[in-house]
């Protein structure tokens, strides 16, 4: 019997894909978020570590839907654009930016964020 005919192979494949998406997003967001927080925002190492640890559950929740969305965007870009390295990277960047913007907006609105408080804080930092 071939593995592809096994009834559990698609379940196993989806589970493996979801696990890979989750691990990749958590690790990527941990290190890039930490770099942004320390280098651009001026947070201390302790503040950044605390922030990154608190962000892990959110990243775990959005990892599988993001993986599906990213695969669709990259596939669409490779079908309709030149098959070059930069096309895939730009599609990956676009998928990350669009997906994260929408998911973080929902998260912040759910927990009571307001644009006014953010703009006041930004003005005070200048």
From Swiss-Prot:
The chain crosses the membrane at residues 23-43. GO terms for molecular function: L-amino acid efflux transmembrane transporter activity. Keywords: Amino-acid transport, Cell inner membrane, Cell membrane, Membrane, Transmembrane, Transmembrane helix, Transport. The keyword Transmembrane applies. It comes from Sodalis glossinidius (strain morsitans). It is found in: Cell inner membrane. InterPro entries: Ala_export_AlaE (IPR010574). This is L-alanine exporter AlaE. Belongs to the AlaE exporter family. GO terms for cellular component: plasma membrane. It comes from the Bacteria.
